[in-house]
UniProtKB/Swiss-Prot annotation:
Protein name per its UniProtKB record: Peptidase B
Positions bound to Mn(2+) 2: 195, 200, 218, 279
Catalysed reactions listed for this entry: Release of an N-terminal amino acid, Xaa, from a peptide or arylamide. Xaa is preferably Glu or Asp but may be other amino acids, including Leu, Met, His, Cys and Gln
Pfam families: DUF3663, Peptidase_M17
GO molecular function: manganese ion binding; metalloaminopeptidase activity
UniProt keyword Metal-binding present: yes
Length: 427
């Protein structure tokens, strides 16, 4: 390994020779990042991306000014999907170093899992990886059940079974119980539900290649809520939380579901399929039914659900939907504390009624007359949350993954959202 490049911080502007807007400069001692007090974390992250682009793979963060947040900002920009990198971290006290180490372990797990090729990460592998992560932080308090294939149909998990039956890799439901109380009858404080589509071709409503090439990341919601639970545990979560991951491939075959099919759910709802590429909501519905049955104070679902959310917010913000204004405010406050970008989008009672079907109670996609696709998708999900007006948050994970590098991120997964959800769980 080469000698580490030293990275220091300064509140002084760079020498004029580097230009008026220089964020870093190079000298015989290493690289200096020049902070301006406006968005120091963002500046550090962007500078780290540039340093990685120079081919520097071994750095030492040294000198005054390096704390947990600045160290983490550097790593967010420095980490990439190819090759290895080594960072010698600054001196931190034990508590702060533990916080940094937990971020490195858990959020890197989220990023690496989302970046994994679909060939390596099928529905069952995703569920098992989630179990392994959570057992690594709290195995004594974790129990779980994996239901897959025809067992899903027999137990009436019809959304998940319908979407996943077209693949040779069986669909899977992971139901995991984190119960630190030791009381098997303890109330469930929160349920987390994640969309785990390990590859989304669109089914018979097939995607073009330009929209399919990143669909290994369509399990980003499942990875995010798994990481959030693990991270909350490391921060001292002492309440019972259940995790439901709805994992499947959405592929084309002679056994794949088709337009016009009607899915009959356990809560009595019937859904006509008019777009097989609107499959995420169909699998989440099963998880939300189970979550509602637990009568928790809080239900959070996370999913890379709609292109409409990305159209509205790009890849820079996660979209938040809720009927519960107070709860939405709490999540946005958690996001602000963790310096993670969330933006609330509209969800009103009328969005629940913008999914008309001629043959069933609901359609799985809105018609051209109702173009607010992210809001109607959230409205669809609300039909599977028993008390949807209170205690439920839906996160459309538009900031989970980037197809191409930008100035602050490499291509691939970001890990954004993990800390915010963990913060809310432990508040």
């Amino acid at each position: 390994m080469t000698e580490a490049m030293k990275i220091t911080l300064s509140t002084q502007p760079a020498d004029a020779r580097w230009g008026d807007k220089a964020t870093y400069s190079i000298n015989n001692d290493g690289i200096t990042l020049h902070l301006n007090g406006k968005d120091d974390s963002g500046l550090i992250q962007r500078a780290a991306r540039k340093i990685d682009g120079l081919g520097i793979k071994h750095v030492q963060l040294t000198g005054a000014g390096w704390d947990v947040e600045r160290s983490w900002a550097f790593w967010q920009g420095y980490k990439g999907p190819k090759g290895s990198r080594k960072v010698e971290w600054p001196d931190l006290d034990d508590e702060k170093r533990k916080e940094l180490d937990n971020r490195l372990t858990i959020i890197d797990w989220v990023r690496d899992t989302i970046n994994a090729p679909a060939e390596e990460l099928g529905p069952e592998q995703l569920a098992q990886r989630a179990v392994d992560l959570l057992c690594s932080v709290a195995c004594d308090h974790v129990s779980y059940r994996i239901t897959k294939g025809e067992d899903l149909r027999e137990q009436n998990y019809m959304g998940l079974h319908t979407v996943g039956r077209g693949s040779d890799r069986a669909p899977v439901l992971l139901a995991l119980d984190y119960n630190p109380t030791g009381d098997k009858d303890a109330p469930v404080y929160a349920c987390l539900v994640g969309k785990g589509i390990t590859f989304d071709s669109g089914g018979y409503s097939i995607k073009q290649s330009a929209f399919m090439d990143s669909m290994k990341s369509d399990m980003g919601g499942a990875a995010t809520v798994t990481g959030a639970l693990a991270f909350a545990i490391t921060r001292g979560l002492n309440k019972r939380v259940k995790l439901y991951l709805c994992c499947a491939d959405n592929l084309i075959s002679g056994n794949a579901f088709k337009l016009g099919d009607i899915i009959h759910y356990r809560n009595g709802k019937n859904v006509e399929v008019m777009n097989t590429d609107a499959e995420g909501r169909l699998v989440l519905a099963d998880g939300l039914i189970d979550a509602s049955a637990q009568k928790p104070e809080l239900i959070i679902d996370a999913a890379t659900l709609t292109g409409a959310a990305k159209t509205a917010l790009g890849n820079d913000y996660h979209a938040l939907f809720s009927f519960d204004d107070a709860l939405a405010g709490r999540l946005l406050a958690s996001a602000a504390e963790e310096n993670e970008p969330f933006w609330r989008l509209p969800l009103a009672e009328f969005h629940r009624n913008q999914l008309p079907s001629n043959f069933a109670e609901l359609n799985n996609t809105g018609s051209a007359a109702y173009p607010a696709g992210a809001s109607t998708a959230a409205g669809f999900l609300s039909h599977f949350v028993e008390n949807y007006q209170q205690g439920w948050l839906h996160i459309d994970c538009s900031a989970t993954y980037r197809k191409a590098p930008v100035e602050q991120w490499s291509a691939g997964a970001t890990g954004l959202g993990v800390r915010t959800i963990a913060n809310l769980l432990t508040a």
